[in-house]
Amino acid sequence: CACLVGSEMCIRDSIRARGADRMSSFGDFISLSDVCDKSTALVIKREVSDGVIAPGYTDEALEILKAKKKGNYCVIEIDPSYEPAPIERKDVFGITFEQGRNELHIDDDFFSNIVTENKELTEQAKIDLAISMITLKYTQSNSVCYVKGGQAIGIGAGQQSRIHCTRLAGSKADNWWLRQSPQVLGLQFVDGIRRADRDNTIDLYIGEDYMDVLAEGEWQKFFKVKPDVFTAEEKRAWLDKNTDVALGSDAFFPFGDNIERAHKSGVKYVAQPGGSVRDDHVIDTCNKYGMVMSFTGIRLFHH
């Protein structure tokens, strides 16, 4: 969760960060890059969260957060000027592993090595790809990240194969988009339903287990009016409207199947290290769909 200067921007970005995956953000730990003010604290107060870390808190914000979870909410203040040691060390069963700290710096030339026929990388695409790289820098490998409009919308982390990362992140990106469909926005929930229950209900409604909330005797628990089934054809038609999505990968794509899956979720821009013996196949698949792909030459593994 990122926070910018200014109360309104801070709140907006906090909400967007959590909205990337409403299911996984349940019981999260919130990280803010600026001082937490009263308005942001009020937003955090209503969320199911285990803690927050920020470079500072206003007096009003601190009083609000101190009362959360009956005083057991974890509130951490960090020194924004702190510089970690240049060498990272990890002890595993008596063996010490050392490596240089990840100091990835993304500048205007970071995505300049475009290897596809389409080389039109927009400014928004550069921003989105940069966000994907930053997200991957701190995400358990193997990982893939989908980004749209300055917001991560699907993160697939900790998988044992690249294609499973792409599928997992893609399914989350699809769910993010489906939640904005007319079918979901038009749902009439019963009065007093808790937000977490509403999120879970939507997740079931847009998924394969929709009858869990639409069966007779069940739908009445969640809705005032029984919704129509959100058919596979309707979902596909809505997903096809999601375009200009950016995708980053923390290591190279070994085969073009990752690009095929990414295309189904509206991906147009791709950034990955490159270096696979099948790079030509991956590039050809991107060219088939008119995608723009950059080879960064940098692997972002995090274990």
Can you say where each PLM-predicted feature lies in the sequence?
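C-terminal structured "cap/appendage" subdomains that terminate the fold
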Residues: 247, 251-291
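Phosphate/diphosphate-binding loops
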Residues: 22-88, 273-302
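Generic long, charged, amphipathic alpha-helical segments
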Residues: 172-265
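Short, compositionally biased leader-like segments
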Residues: 88-126
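Single conserved hydrophobic/aromatic residue that forms the stacking wall/gate
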Residues: 1-6, 10-11
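Short, basic/aromatic recognition patches
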Residues: 117-142
